[in-house]
Amino acid sequence: MTKMIDISAMPAELSEKNTLTARRLGIDTHEHAVIYMRADCHICRAEGFNNHARIKVSGPSNKAIIATLNLVVTDLLSPGQIGLSETAWLRLQLNEGDPVRLIHPAPLLSLSAVRAKIFGEPLDQNNLDAIVGDIAAGRFSDIHLSAFLTASAAHEQSFEEIRDLTLSMVNVGQRLDWGRAPIVDKHCVGGLPGNRTTPIVVAICVAAGLTMPKTSSRAITSPAGTADTMETLAPVELDVSAMRRVVETVGGCIVWGGAVALSPVDDTLIRIERALDIDSDGQLVASVLSKKIAAGATHLVIDMPVGPTAKVRTEEAAARLEGLFARVGSNLGLNLKIMRTDGSQPVGRGIGPALEAWDVLAVLNNEGHNVPDLTVQATLLAGELLEMGQAAPAGRGAELATELLVNGRAWRAFEAICEAQGGFREPPTAPHYQVIQSPRDGVVGRIDNRRLAKAAKLAGAPASKAAGIVLHAKLGSQMVKGQPLYSLHSQSLGELSYAHDYLASQPEIIEIEEEQCPR
């Protein structure tokens, strides 16, 4: 007869057999928690741990993580040692030589819901709560995450699924309550180089007396995110308490969302979406709205650029996405307005963190004639928020936004935000640049946003803050052969050469068309 064993009643000395001594290997595995064990380790044999197994690891601080196992077949580790990647080491808060305990994690029950989605079945709130909870706890490997995102993209998510996913993502993170209303916010769907309206919009709204706690992302696939650009002007890595202090002091902020962890699962999903190049409508809506709800927003304007090389390419796609945003947002209590904008070309002159920051400063310092498109875009978006927040009469928002720029109040509000976040600083400039000239006489007829953004990244953006591209011409500009078309800016000559070689192979990134003579 088989004898049942109560595992919970096992003596402590048995659990100690699953303990190894920690060694910091200094291996950067990005966001992956990875552990390293000898292939002949007695625990691997006893527990049946194989390469890439998912293992629950805990240390003396009582913190525990789920990590991926890599087996070592050399003498990198001594018998009785376990190596840890930087991510695993820091999450467990270990010291060299600490005892580390290893056990099998609990079964991943939410995978049954992922399998259901793979076969096209809809997921309910309980399914999504379980999946999102396991993602937040680090129980999903990248393979599991990829399966969930791919299935969600392949089988269109219903309104109910998108709404429930949004709520699940909000509920696993912090949710801010500012104790007052309205709390205004904005988001840009993206896909357009430049277009750095957020710092200007926040400054205008704060100058008008509205509260705007803006959390922004770093670049995912673009040459710059709002957080990257703002970081060239002031610190952005503030925790929730520091963010709250800034907002209570000056009325608004522009901080990196990753530091405040308001929708932590979203950052994990975005990392996988970037690798897979997947950006489904349902996931986009849940991503945006979960962060806005978690930040305490009550009124939201969404900038949706539409153009042949933008993220949203057709009016039909824009209408579909707009409908999803409006329905889900309204159902979750958000006062939301979508503004479709021109996505046929970059907004502003700079593409890259510091170059976009210089555009922002030009607008705020009443030099917007240098970037008129950015000035108009920012005042339209800010004007809509001013009207929604009842800081301006209906139909007068853009006028008031322009007035706040001209009289300097928006600039003073921006300065106050920068000082409250740690101090204003001037954006850097790149030591190397090269001007690309128009190859012929004519008119700028088309700009490929995607390939222009790729060139800016090859020049070093966003990792090199001063790198990127400055446009010297826009759609409709009359060009003479040899006239500056755009310039490349890089931190190193190697990156400059790399980007230039790419541009030389892509002469149609900015197309110069022959000017049609009137008959």
Curated annotation (Swiss-Prot):
SUPFAM superfamilies: Nucleoside phosphorylase/phosphoribosyltransferase catalytic domain, Nucleoside phosphorylase/phosphoribosyltransferase N-terminal domain, Pyrimidine nucleoside phosphorylase C-terminal domain. One of its GO terms (molecular function) is thymidine phosphorylase activity. Its EC number is 2.4.2.4. Signal peptide: none annotated. GO terms for biological process: pyrimidine nucleobase metabolic process; pyrimidine nucleoside metabolic process. Keywords: Glycosyltransferase, Transferase. The keyword Transferase applies. It is an enzyme of class 2 (transferase). It catalyses: thymidine + phosphate = 2-deoxy-alpha-D-ribose 1-phosphate + thymine. InterPro entries: Glycosyl_Trfase_fam3 (IPR000312), Glycosyl_Trfase_fam3_N_dom (IPR017459), Glycosyl_Trfase_fam3_N_dom_sf (IPR036320), Nuc_phospho_transferase (IPR035902), PYNP-like_C_sf (IPR036566), PYNP_C (IPR013102), Pyrmidine_PPase_CS (IPR017872), Thym_Pase_Put (IPR028579). Belongs to the thymidine/pyrimidine-nucleoside phosphorylase family. Type 2 subfamily. PANTHER family: THYMIDINE PHOSPHORYLASE. This is Putative thymidine phosphorylase. It comes from Maricaulis maris (strain MCS10).
